[in-house]
Curated annotation (Swiss-Prot):
GO biological process: 'de novo' pyrimidine nucleobase biosynthetic process; 'de novo' UMP biosynthetic process; pyrimidine ribonucleoside biosynthetic process
Enzyme Commission numbers on file: 2.4.2.10
Record InterPro entries: OPRT (IPR023031), Or_phspho_trans_dom (IPR004467), PRibTrfase_dom (IPR000836), PRTase-like (IPR029057)
Cellular component aspect of the GO annotation: cytoplasm
Keyword Metal-binding in record: no
Stated name of the protein: Orotate phosphoribosyltransferase
Coiled-coil portions: none
Keywords: Glycosyltransferase, Magnesium, Pyrimidine biosynthesis, Transferase
Function summary: Catalyzes the transfer of a ribosyl phosphate group from 5-phosphoribose 1-diphosphate to orotate, leading to the formation of orotidine monophosphate (OMP).
Length: 219
């Protein structure tokens, strides 16, 4: 496992963003783990998380001109990554959207950099059903931008349904024709649990969950 994947999973565990046990997901599935990016709730945690995102996107080779964070969770994540990239000497424009368009002041739905004619990278926490990401793709195209790729924190690598054996991330990647990468995945989580004495007991439930719902890695 690469260093940034291990650092991210350790950070998520420390922040209580990654929890193990039994959790009922929105899909109704009983999952042995749960990820909540909202737990990265301090300047220090977001700074470290931004570095993990930056490492992942640098390793991917995706070319882009603007960083875009979909409302709401994507906004601090994209901001943290953009700040980290600036520290590394790459100061990129940043844009994000409102859930509701304003009809006063500067107006509109978008805040930040102009995306017209630019390659745009979407930064978010996870892709669950893909609804929010598809909305972001539409917003970028309507603003004259070209979606260049998507980076998320965690890829659960599980099928959407019994009739669609792709994950939500795979579906979005195929439909949009752009790469979807993750800082870490379920496969990484299994490796991480195996190497952590406090988590090794969760490996069997994780393996069973992957056997029932897993898909091939997208990275």
């Amino acid at each position: 496992m690469s260093d940034h994947r291990h650092r991210f999973l350790q950070l998520a565990l420390t922040a209580d963003a990654l929890r193990f046990g039994q959790f009922t997901l929105k899909s109704g599935r009983l999952s042995p783990y749960f990820f909540n990016a909202g737990r990265f709730d301090s300047g220090s945690l977001l700074s470290q998380l931004g570095a993990c995102y930056a490492d992942a996107i640098d390793a991917s080779g995706i070319k882009y001109d603007v960083v875009f964070g979909p409302a709401y969770k994507g906004i601090p994540l994209a901001t943290a990554m953009a700040c980290e990239l600036a520290q590394r000497g790459r100061d990129l424009p940043l844009s994000f959207n409102r859930k509701e368009a304003k009809d006063h002041g500067e107006g509109g739905q978008l805040i930040g950099a102009d995306m017209q004619g630019k390659r745009v990278l979407i930064v978010d926490d996870v892709i669950t059903a893909g609804t929010a990401i598809r909305e972001a793709l539409g917003i970028i195209r309507a603003a004259g931008g070209t979606p260049a790729g998507i980076v998320v924190a965690l890829d659960r690598q599980e099928i959407a349904s019994e009739t669609d054996r792709r994950s939500a991330a795979q579906s979005v990647a195929e439909e949009a024709g752009i790469p979807v990468i993750a800082v870490a995945s379920l496969a990484d989580l299994l490796d991480f649990a195996s190497g952590n004495p406090e988590l090794v007991g969760y490996r069997q439930p994780l393996e069973a969950y992957r056997a029932q719902y897993g898909v091939r890695s997208i990275r």
